[in-house]
Amino acid sequence: MAVSTSHFRSLCASSRSLSRTGIVAPISCRGYATTEPSPSATSTTTTTTARRRTTFKDKLNAGPSFADFVGNDNAPLDPSEAYALKTALVGPAGRKKEMTRLPSWLKTPIPDSKNYQRLKKDLRGLNLHTVCEEARCPNISDCWGGSDKSAATATIMLMGDTCTRGCRFCSVKTSRTPSPLDPHEPENTAEAISRWGLGYVVLTSVDRDDLADGGARHFAETVMKIKQKAPSILVECLTGDYAGDLEMVKLVARSGLDVYAHNVETVEALTPQVRDRRANFQQSIRVLEAAKNAQPSLITKTSLMLGLGETDEQLWDALRQLRVVNVDVVTFGQYMRPTKRHMAVHEYVTPDRFELWRQRALDMGFLYCASGPLVRSSYKAGEAFIENVLKKRRAASGSTETVGVRPVAVDEVTR
């Protein structure tokens, strides 16, 4: 064995001698019966190459030290400095583009809780869709992820996941010929909601201009199924405009729901640039007015996005028109561009300004206003307040049924 080991080492001697001259990189050779040579046993010299400097390392070395950071006695940033948007170069080398970073107040955690997974599994099992997923809502981790399931909120999207309209702010799929309605959807929706044990639920839908009634009867049937299975659940319906057919609006308003919501989305002047050409601000105002007239005890609700280029005067005008038709609740949220194919963000509105408009809305007489960068029309904080108001009304009337609402048959002709 010793002879074979010495013979093998002699074969590697030439390689080691060449490595000393720097011609060939050193090669470590071991026989099957040899042990790892110790550092002192080898005379090979290793050549180390200097690591390439990077832009990040240069910036890090040039920046403040930890001692500087801890001992900094500079005054706090004022609001304008704290809210200043930062930019970054994004893209491959040689083709980088300057992009505005998302403000810190718009960043949310990635959803991955047990409650989130449970809700998602139930929805998939019953072939149901939610606007939370389809519209890429930033609040999904908050609304679905709470440990208290009674506080969880999932906005069910009826009549499929494909819309017949193409609003320039919305990421929901569009088609002129979406799939037919699922006749089992009202029953499946009611079953899922009763299974979750929620106290408040939001129903919405895609626009279905391909249907004669715009899907109003399907919507109303779903509400009635829910009330049959769980009369105590409070139901909010966020509907479309049914192409201006106010009889269909009245049908849904009288189906037994508690809150009728329809979004004007933006101020009147920007509506043609923001919404589909088949929608308009005055038509939305008429929808909200018809719902309130059909069932005066209903809470009516709408929502506006900020950051689209609206002016203060345009916002004042929108709020005045909403109060004229007795809209009870309004919400303000930041428009966030879903993809590069959609409208660009004109402005990231600061939290302070959202608070200013919340106070202005309350001063104008709105029952409630949820206003903030991440607030959406079905934001659960607003629902908690509305739920409390409705429960107080029920307690005052001594009933567990929807106060002042008489559910009508789906095929009943409204007058």
Curated annotation (Swiss-Prot):
Binds 2 [4Fe-4S] clusters per subunit. One cluster is coordinated with 3 cysteines and an exchangeable S-adenosyl-L-methionine. It comes from the Eukaryota. It is found in: Mitochondrion. SMART domains: Elp3. Its cofactor is [4Fe-4S] cluster. It catalyses: [[Fe-S] cluster scaffold protein carrying a second [4Fe-4S](2+) cluster] + N(6)-octanoyl-L-lysyl-[protein] + 2 oxidized [2Fe-2S]-[ferredoxin] + 2 S-adenosyl-L-methionine + 4 H(+) = [[Fe-S] cluster scaffold protein] + N(6)-[(R)-dihydrolipoyl]-L-lysyl-[protein] + 4 Fe(3+) + 2 hydrogen sulfide + 2 5'-deoxyadenosine + 2 L-methionine + 2 reduced [2Fe-2S]-[ferredoxin]. [4Fe-4S] cluster 1 binds at C132, C137, C143, S378. Residues 1-32 form a transit peptide. The keyword Iron-sulfur applies. [4Fe-4S] cluster 2 binds at C163, C167, C170. Its EC number is 2.8.1.8. This is Lipoyl synthase, mitochondrial. It comes from Neosartorya fischeri (strain ATCC 1020 / DSM 3700 / CBS 544.65 / FGSC A1164 / JCM 1740 / NRRL 181 / WB 181). The lineage of its organism: Eukaryota, Fungi, Dikarya, Ascomycota, Pezizomycotina.
